[in-house]
Structure formats: C-alpha cells, structure tokens
Amino acid sequence: MQVAFYKGRKRLFNRLTSWWLRGPYSHVELVLGYDQAGQAICASSSMMDGGVRVKHMTLNPDHWDVVSASGSADAAWAWLRKHEGAGYDYLGLLGFVARAIGHDKSRFVCSEAVAEMLGMADGWRFDPCSLYAALAWRESSAVAAAA
C-alpha cells in the first residue's frame, strides 16, 4: 500500500498547519489503488469533504510525497466500511494545538484515519508529520529485520 502526504501550500490553512506542525505536511491520504484513468483511489478524513471518505485523485508530485507502507488493503477497506461518512474531528484538529483538549472518538482527522486503516494503535496521536516519521521508522525497521 501507499500513503500520500500533502505538501502543497495553496491554501492558507495548509500553510498554517504545516507551520504549526513544524514540518512540510498538512494532510495525508491512504492510497488503496489506482483506477483505469490512472487516478489514485484515496481514503482519509477531510475537512473540505466533511469527514471520512474515498476519493479519486491525481497526486501531482509537486504537491504530494507518496511512500510505501505495510498494511492490509482488506483491513483498510473493512475500516472504511465501518467508518465511511463519520464526521471530521474538529476537536482533534484543535488537539494538534493543545493535546490536552483530546478528540471526538466518533470523528476523525486525516492522520488518525490513515493510521487506523494501516492498523496502527492510538491513531488519534498522529498528525501528518508525525505519521510520516512513524511510517519511515516502521518501514526501515522492517527492512533491517529482514536483512
């Protein structure tokens, strides 16, 4: 499977988010495959789209970093069937600013949804930048263990 991290700077919200997180990323999508037109079939939770959803997207490399990640596509689709349509976690978004605020367990931010689809524990703890770091560590550990 693949994970796409948004590094675009088009919207003020994206610039502020990446600035606050002290990293290049403001959003993340799980890439579940590609359609016949070559667009990525992505799953995440999006403020613009109102929550958890599947969306076909063009992942322009100028705006997205796409990395490989271990995980089960079947498990990701099962998670989506259970949670698709769940709202965006605005409280969790504020949690990026002040972790003590917590999050709404019935709603999701992008990184939380992607982490959970990948089978990672405590997905609510991740923001896009920390999820990128965790996946890089997880993948490098798997390579080292296989050597």
Where are these regions (language model features)?
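Alpha-helix C-terminal capping segments
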Residues: 57, 66-70, 113-119
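A structural motif
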Residues: 70-92
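Exposed alpha-helical structural elements
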Residues: 12-15, 75, 79, 130
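Activation targets extended, charge/polar-rich intrinsically disordered C-terminal tails
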Residues: 93-147
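Glycine-rich catalytic cores of cysteine/serine-nucleophile enzymes that process amide/ester linkages
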Residues: 3-68, 93-102
